[in-house]
């Protein structure tokens, strides 16, 4: 099963995303409110995808992305942001983001963004 981590400072948003993902058959391994919690939980968790917010009250999601890709380059990262700014999108891509999802998004957008990042499996 594909394992997902949710990293956002909004507990409400994390809970809503978790409900959608789990009802769609995904396993949410853990949630984190920031980088310290993310890095304390991710090693050995088997996470294949991190949904990562870009804006936090005390840190920058792009910095978290850079650190995550440096330490765990195989983990896919889907950035989540409410700001549609070309420079931010370009920087996220440069740092290794595997996709960007813009808030507000609906269930179909969330699931299709994740499905694009799933490992391809032969049937």
Please provide the spans of the model-predicted regions.
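Two-component/phosphorelay signaling modules centered on CheY-like receiver
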Residues: 11-30
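Acidic, metal-coordinating helix/loop segments flanking the phosphotransfer/catalytic sites
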Residues: 31-49
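Acidic catalytic/metal-coordinating carboxylates
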Residues: 34, 60-63
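The feature encodes the CheY-like receiver
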Residues: 57
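Short amphipathic alpha-helix used as the core "switch/output" element in two-component signaling
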Residues: 62-74
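Alpha4 helix (beta4-alpha4-beta5 surface) of REC/receiver domains from two-component response regulators
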Residues: 63, 84-99
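C-terminal output helix
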Residues: 87, 105-115
